[in-house]
Design a protein with these regions (language model features):
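Sec-dependent signal peptide recognition
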Residues: 1-7
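Active-site-proximal beta-strand elements of phosphoester/diester hydrolases
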Residues: 22-32, 127-136, 154-168
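Metal-dependent phosphoester-hydrolase catalytic domains
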Residues: 105-107, 184-197, 202-284
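Structural recognition of the beta-strand scaffold that forms the well-ordered cores
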Residues: 24-27, 55-59, 86-87, 93-94, ...
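A solvent-exposed, charged loop/short amphipathic helix patch at secondary-structure junctions
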Residues: 143-172, 213
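Short, solvent-exposed beta-strand-terminating loops
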Residues: 128-152, 199, 203-205, 243-251
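N-terminal, active-site-proximal structural segment of metallo-dependent hydrolase catalytic domains
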Residues: 5, 15-79, 279
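Structured beta-strand-rich core segments of catalytic domains in phosphoester-bond hydrolases
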Residues: 37, 55, 60-149
């Protein structure tokens, strides 16, 4: 939804199993390829140069004016002395310091309501599969407790405080379908002994951030909500990397939305200007 990035270091075992390899993985929502802010595209380039991630997952790739965003980015990063590999895509994207062996669509884009792609690399003898996901932005149900409609973002007469109603609205999106497509596809990759990573803008909070310890803050209105997508992934054995490092959601909320930019009007930065809609919706 808005330009935001989350950078984490993943540790993977190499083929010899006695050594460990650190990979810096970046999830980056680029807010319509940076076009929403003056010189935003070059801000994207600058951030990548500064952070120097090994693997990047992008959300909101648009290929405006028929220009491939990934190809343009690879060219401009090379001018800055950084070699990255990437293949053309839309909605979601992947860049890597390692040559991409293959890339394919896992969940196709339809009516701009989310998509998933995956790419495979070989790193020090290990095959790694990276999924880049930008999940459905409609029925954004975490706005309901804040008193805003999650499709129109208009203020409602009163907040929704019934968990079953919130989760029913959440399931009306395609987010759970998109995550189940990842899980089903990734099981086949794991059966082949490949390491699987997922990065994306989920447009949905983690259930780990909506338990008893946070029910009375951030306009959670006393509710514990087991949000679908994060629960599906954790039940299939995946780890929420930020929560692995920072397990306390009260002290370390890890908000990725909304973000602040002094050059942009507040109304363009947040969907609910009269509510506390801070959430962690970008994940690795």
């Amino acid at each position: 939804m808005r330009s935001v990035f989350i950078l984490l270091v993943a540790v993977v075992m190499t083929a010899c199993q006695s050594s460990r390899k650190e990979l810096k993985v970046l999830q980056f929502n680029i807010w319509q390829e940076g076009t929403s802010v003056e010189n935003g595209y070059w801000g994207i380039v600058d951030n990548i140069v500064e952070l120097s991630p090994d693997l990047i997952t992008f959300s909101e790739v648009r290929n405006y004016n028929g220009i491939s965003f990934i190809s343009r980015l690879v060219t401009d990063l090379e001018k800055r002395g950084m070699r990255y590999y990437g293949k053309e895509s839309v909605s979601t994207g992947i860049l890597s310091k390692y040559e991409i062996q293959s890339q394919e669509v896992v969940f196709p884009l339809k009516n701009d309501r989310g998509s998933v792609i995956k790419a495979m690399f070989q790193i020090e003898g290990e095959e790694i599969v990276l999924y880049s996901a930008h999940l459905d932005w409609m029925n954004c149900s975490y706005y309901l407790p804040r008193g805003y409609d999650g499709c129109t973002w208009k203020k409602m007469k009163q907040p929704v405080v019934d968990v079953d109603s919130i989760l029913a609205d959440n399931k009306a999106s395609f987010r759970d379908d998109e995550v189940r497509a990842i899980v089903e596809d990734a099981r086949k990759e794991r059966e082949h002994g490949r390491i699987v990573m997922i990065g994306g803008d989920f447009n949905e909070p983690s259930h780990l951030d909506w338990q008893a310890d946070t029910k009375d803050i951030r306009e959670h209105r006393g509710m514990v909500v087991n949000w679908d997508c994060s629960k599906i992934l954790i039940e299939d054995g995946y780890k929420d990397t930020f929560r692995e490092i920072y397990p306390n959601p009260v002290i370390y909320p890890g908000f990725t939305f909304p973000t602040n930019n002094i050059e942009v009007d507040l109304k363009k930065l947040t969907w609910a200007p009269e509510a506390d809609d801070r959430e962690r919706i970008d994940f690795i």
